[in-house]
């Protein structure tokens, strides 16, 4: 049981770090024809990330930014609650609070990435048709899966 909780803790920390990276880095869409990428915050061309997004004032990208920041916040809160419950909870109880907080993180990731996918993943406004998703987009979907698994495992596990 201790090994399972330690492994879950490590995966939770890795998920939080991946959420930070995927939200901060500007590689959500990558152009095939040039050294250019688009993130949640800026356009990057030739390694220079000074360009602002052409759609930066749209409500959809602001919603994606907000939900990704909320997912990071809920992931960290869930981690802190898990550590707190680990040392204060009585034996036999379940980690309901940390599990439900992690599932809220999962929901925020789902909403944020779904909005981005619908509005910008295949949009002609990013680049022309010769572009593909960057590692941040893929990393966010991986975090989506991990946060769901972690949330469910927190809900199922009992402290022994």
Curated annotation (Swiss-Prot):
Pfam families for the chain: PMP22_Claudin (PF00822)
PROSITE patterns (alphabetical): PMP22_1, PMP22_2
Transmembrane stretches, start-end: 1-21, 67-87, 95-115, 137-157
Keywords, sorted A to Z: Glycoprotein, Membrane, Transmembrane, Transmembrane helix
Chief place where the protein resides: membrane
Annotated compartments: Membrane
GO cellular component term of the entry, any: plasma membrane
Superkingdom classification of source: Eukaryota
Glycosylation sites per record: 35, 43, 128
One of the GO biological process terms: apoptotic process
Mode of membrane association: Multi-pass membrane protein
Similarity field: Belongs to the PMP-22/EMP/MP20 family.
Name recorded for this polypeptide: Epithelial membrane protein 1
Gene source species: Mus musculus (Mouse)
Lineage of source species: Eukaryota, Metazoa, Chordata, Craniata, Vertebrata
């Amino acid at each position: 049981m201790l090994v399972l909780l330690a492994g879950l803790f490590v995966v939770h920390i890795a998920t939080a770090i991946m959420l930070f990276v995927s939200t901060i880095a500007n590689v959500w869409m990558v152009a095939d024809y040039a050294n250019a990428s688009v993130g949640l915050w800026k356009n990057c061309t030739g390694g220079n990330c000074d360009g602002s997004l052409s759609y930066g004032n749209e409500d959809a990208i602001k919603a994606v930014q907000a939900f990704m920041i909320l997912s990071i916040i809920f992931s960290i809160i869930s981690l802190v609650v898990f550590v707190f419950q680990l040392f204060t909870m009585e034996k036999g109880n379940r980690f309901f609070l940390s599990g439900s907080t992690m599932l809220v993180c999962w929901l925020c990731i789902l909403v944020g990435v779904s909005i981005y996918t619908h509005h910008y993943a295949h949009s002609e406004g990013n680049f022309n048709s010769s572009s593909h998703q960057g590692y941040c987009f893929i990393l966010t979907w991986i975090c989506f899966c991990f946060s769901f698994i972690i949330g469910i495992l927190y809900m199922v596990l009992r402290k022994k």
